[in-house]
Amino acid sequence: MTVIERFKSNLKGKQNLINFGFILIGLFGCYLLIAWASYSPLDNAWSTASSVTHDTVLNKTGKLGAWLIDLLYAFLGNVAFVVPFVLFSFAIYALIFRIAEQWKWRNLLLQIGSFILLLIGLSGIASVLLPNSAYYLAGGFVGGMLQSLLNGIIGQVGLLLLSTVLMSIGFYFCSGQLLFSLGIQFYQWLFIKKPQSNTILEAANPHLNAQNNETTKSIVANPSENAHVDQLVTHENATEQLTDVSAFTRPTIHGLKSSSTLNTDKTKYNQVNAQPLTDPMMFKIEKKVILPKINMQHPENELTNLSMEQTNSIDNLEIRLPKVHLNTAVTNPEIKTVEHHAQNRPLEMPTQIQPVFDQPITPTISLNVEDQPLDIESNEAQLAEEFAAAEQMRLANMEQRAKAEGLEETFNQIITSPTLTVSINESSEQPTEKDLNPTHHDNGANYPKGYGKTLLHPLLQRNNVVEKPTTPLPTLELLAKNPVQTQQITEQEIFDTSHRLENALANYNVKATVEDVLVGPVVTRYEIKPAAGIKANKVTALANDLARELMFKAIRITEVVPGKPYMGIETPNTHRQTVWLRDVLDSEAFRHTQATLPMALGKDISGQPIVVDMAKMPHLLVAGQTGGGKSVGINTMILSLLFKLTPEQVRFIMIDPKVVELSVYNDIPHLLTPVVTDMKKAANALRWAVGEMERRYLLISHLQVRNIEGYNDKIDQASAMNFPIPDPTWRPADSIGQLPPPLTKLSYIVLIVDEFADLIMSAGKEVEEYIMRIAQKARAVGIHLILATQRPSTDVITGVIKANIPSRIAFTVASQIDSRTILDAGGAEALLGRGDMLYSASGSPEIMRIHGAFMSDEEVQRIADNWRARGKPQYLDSVVASHEDENDSRTNTITELDPLFDEIVAYVIESGVTSISGIQRRFSLGFNRAGRIIDQMEAQAIISEPGKGGKREVLAR
């Protein structure tokens, strides 16, 4: 490439042209500075031009420079030197701080107007305070005009005040904010203080500051509260390098936290760490510390005094303390304070100790046993009183519970039992060394007795025993509270990526500019505006090439940004944040949701929580390869329902071929059947769901409503009227009672299949038919389906399933073909894993990128245990019962034939009618009784099994 071509390439783009203009302004300012430095009033210039001085030019810049500087002196007087200095300084500042990157013409016009006000004010002040020269006025033509116009009206003092006001306004809006910021930063640097003012870019652009008031003012990295001191120093240094992004106007940045939030987080952090950072006695202990053992055997023994000597080495930390012998019934005496004579303050033993000084200091602690006496008798008396009060309170609570459950006699027997009386002599016996040392026990003799109340090892026990909660629903206290996370991204990083992105697109002949930037917890979206005539598919085809040039793992390009005429390019953040389930469930979107079946998925790319309604989906297909976060996403959906709904509102049928994914939910009261791990039983569960769907449709049709919401409203109305609705499908032969049972509200049913591919392989077409029927009809009766698979291939996700399940979620997949199989669109192959997903809602052409919420296995276990403590599940055996089981139950009733059996057999053989409805009409029987007679005839080989159309053949003719 030649020098001319390189020069032309550097001039491409608006920013480069503006920078070139700044260079010209700087050169012109330097030229005027030289002209001002060599100015002579005798030069042949504008104010002194004559034939006498025609050839007299002493100025180093020639006639042009002499004329220009003479004009400035003529108009501004002594203020003329300000113009060349400002032009030169402004050009240098604009090039150093890259003003061209956020250039706007209105800012230039504002600064030009402010500069003119500044010059007018300075000229007025000069005309009042400075004497006139023999060659020009002190304030020039401008100052003289102000004198002649305003001196007679407001006088010299008024003119001075007015000029000062004009100068102050012009100075502030022209460059005053910049100089103030520089002065504050210089002062803070001089006294080694951390800058707290706004950055230079923000100060130099007052309009941008006002425009972006609600955008982030600072970006900080919040270090861990328990980090090492040198890590804290590293974080502080990194924090000082982060700058404000609010003034970065092109592209506009959204999604960064406000300064108030960050300052609040920083204040909390400082409060938590105030003691370790300011206490010189804190030190880091890496050796094993032998905790003190207190001898309470004899009152005459004395408690030790502590003395601490600080040395200059950190080789060994040895603490030797006296032994412990417990004599009384109180086995855990508490030492509240120990006087530390070196500092005359209590010495606390922190659970986690951090160094707070540069040079390590090793404290040597020695304990002497001959200093201060300890009043053992008073402590023992106080502890005995506290123990007695606690024991009385415990017995009172036990008595109240016994009365509530009607077990007063049992309680009295327990209280009066002689085995519970413990003599003081036995409790005060001194324990032997064998008793104090558990390793001396005979493990072999105690092993058959089991572990507490069970013979199972604690780690092999499936469910933890939890006390019954008092709240109607689980609380968020079951989830761990995680530290607040902040974006660790700078304005410079955002601009550099934008600049590299524009250059990378230009390399492929795609002219586009970055207009907006949206910073999220996991990815950052750069919204670009392609030039006229550039098609969107030309940009999307460059995804892999752009990822390679920008050195990202993967990028995703969206053709349409909702509500904007831009395309979106999503790039991964260097420091990825974790989206915690507690943060999503604690959001306003989930707390105040009006959804019938609310499910929290995570957060979108802007960090906003996403909550969907399962009742409106109405079914969901989830696919993604191993490690993409599919199982965690399923757990997130289940836990969202468990936090919001009771077993009366929603019931689950869970199918888990992997055995370990959903087994943690066994025995929660929401289940209709234990978690199904056998694929044959899984097919039976789907078949039961189809039968339940038909039964519900029959009930809904009798109540003349259209869906489950209308049905439940009718039941509520009947309950309010105190007139329950009798079951319209009941027949006298269905039960022993003479009256039909009342109808009750129907709960929603959610079927969850964790590995759909395994189910298809084992059951095949039968399962697909059941799923198709459920997906087509079950929405109105409150039965919803969630299918998850690791293998998004066309033989698993068939066209029939896709047609009936419009709502889909795609986690990370291997290829674009798999992405199109799930979503009918690409993009899932460019996801980042660990919960990164694409969500396609039913009836919406938009595909939303969501970062799935994360929770630990312990949190899932705690929530399941919480529900198990609330009640036991009411399982239905018919859910997983097979045809053979039903046939066995039917054969047990065949021995007792119906009294009308012979008459109906004769009618069937004569007429050939084999349908239940025909038997009902002919003999005026109920549906269930007629069905039983048909089953009895089938068992006796009188009629055949139903064929394809449900028709039976008569075999006994």
From Swiss-Prot:
Residues 174-957 are cytoplasmic. The keyword Magnesium does not apply. ATP binds at G627, G628, G629, K630, S631, V632. PROSITE patterns: FTSK. Residues 607-820 form the FtsK domain. GO terms for cellular component: plasma membrane. SMART domains: Ftsk_gamma. One of its GO terms (biological process) is cell division. Its main location: membrane. The chain crosses the membrane at residues 17-37, 77-97, 108-128, 129-149, 153-173. Keywords: ATP-binding, Cell cycle, Cell division, Cell inner membrane, Cell membrane, Chromosome partition, DNA-binding, Membrane, Nucleotide-binding, Transmembrane, Transmembrane helix. It is a multi-pass membrane protein. It comes from the Bacteria. Gene3D superfamilies: 3.30.980.40, P-loop containing nucleotide triphosphate hydrolases, Winged helix-like DNA-binding domain superfamily/Winged helix DNA-binding domain. InterPro entries: FtsK/SpoIIIE/SftA, FtsK_4TM, FtsK_alpha, FtsK_dom, Ftsk_gamma, P-loop_NTPase, WH-like_DNA-bd_sf, WH_DNA-bd_sf. The keyword Cell cycle applies. It is found in: Cell inner membrane. GO terms for molecular function: ATP binding; DNA binding. PANTHER family: DNA TRANSLOCASE FTSK, SPORULATION PROTEIN RELATED. Homohexamer. Forms a ring that surrounds DNA. This is DNA translocase FtsK. It comes from Haemophilus ducreyi (strain 35000HP / ATCC 700724). The lineage of its organism: Bacteria, Pseudomonadati, Pseudomonadota, Gammaproteobacteria, Pasteurellales.
